[in-house]
């Protein structure tokens, strides 16, 4: 059988539609790639349109065969696992053909790399619950993160319950999407470009106080860089207040009567619609 590639819009529903189409057309796929990652190839390639009804049919089928498989499918799609789409597709094919028993085998090649990636993603989300640093941006709490995996759905319930009475956002630089929360409503939505504005004088002083506190409580004679990087991996430092350079603590200077946009327009809007797709609550 000639190699066949399906291309889709990058959403969870779009991926499920690829699975639906492959069964409807009786085709076995070589690869499934998002339109963002697609590169021209000599192989036969077909673009699959997203149809929510078809996507729901596939997910309901998987969930009816195994609730665990449904959770693995949804969380596996959020990982940074290379070629995750084709691996998840192969898992679904084996589930439909052989049943869910293989899911209990941690060494089965159809599920092991997916479970390994999910464990890594869960660990990353757990660390970020302690490493997220918010700034007060004109009444809105704002933060940025640079995760390997799409962890915003995993962080959603934690921060929405912890800051229930606040308005906040967490921007994922890596995947260019943002978690928005206000007045008991939350959404995860794409945001291609975003840069947090400089703080006002009060926020800058609080940032500096936090950095000084962090530096002061350290016991110089007991410094252990290796231990610190084990418990606080260096790849997270870029978005943590205590590791920023001097420019992070310099307040914005107003020019005339012009108002400074400390937070992007629209974040504090109370009526934020729920976002569909792979960013739905896990």
Question: Can you annotate each of these PLM segments?
Answer:
Residues 1-52:
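N-terminal ordered "arm"
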Residues 167, 178-179, 198-278:
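Long, compositionally biased intrinsically disordered terminal regions
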Residues 33-126:
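Charged, alpha-helical interface segments at or near domain boundaries
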Residues 101-190:
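Internal, well-folded beta-alpha domain core
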Residues 49-54, 185-198:
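Acidic, Ser/Thr-rich peripheral helices and adjacent loops at domain boundaries
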Residues 14-25, 89-97, 157-161, 208-215:
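Short, hydrophobic/amphipathic alpha-helical patches that form generic packing surfaces
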Residues 30-41, 169-177, 191-192:
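A generic structural motif
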């Amino acid at each position: 059988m000639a190699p066949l590639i399906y291309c889709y819009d990058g959403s969870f529903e779009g991926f499920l539609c690829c699975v639906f189409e492959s069964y409807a057309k009786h085709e076995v796929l070589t690869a499934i790639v998002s339109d963002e990652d697609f590169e021209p190839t000599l192989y036969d390639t077909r673009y699959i349109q997203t149809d929510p009804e078809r996507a729901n049919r596939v997910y309901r089928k998987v969930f009816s065969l195994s609730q665990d498989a449904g959770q693995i499918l949804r969380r596996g799609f959020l990982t940074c696992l290379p070629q995750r789409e084709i691996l998840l597709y192969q898992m679904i094919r084996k589930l439909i053909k052989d049943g869910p028993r293989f899911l209990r085998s941690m060494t089965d090649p159809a599920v092991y790399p997916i479970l390994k990636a999910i464990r890594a993603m869960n660990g990353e989300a757990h660390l970020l619950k302690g490493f997220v640093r918010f700034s007060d941006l004109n009444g809105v709490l704002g933060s940025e993160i640079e995760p390997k995996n799409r962890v915003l759905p995993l962080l959603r319930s934690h921060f929405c319950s912890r800051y229930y009475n606040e308005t906040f956002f967490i921007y994922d630089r890596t995947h260019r999407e943002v978690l928005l929360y206000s007045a008991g409503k939350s959404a995860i939505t794409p945001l291609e470009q975003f840069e947090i504005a400089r703080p006002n004088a009060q926020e800058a002083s609080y940032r500096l106080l936090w950095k000084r506190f962090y530096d002061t409580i350290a016991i110089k004679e007991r410094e252990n860089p290796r231990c610190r990087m084990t418990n606080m991996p260096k790849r997270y430092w870029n978005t943590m207040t205590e590791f920023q350079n001097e420019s992070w603590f310099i307040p914005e200077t107003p020019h005339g009567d012009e108002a400074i946009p400390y937070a992007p327009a629209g974040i504090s809007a109370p009526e934020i619609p729920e976002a569909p797709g792979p960013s739905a609550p896990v």
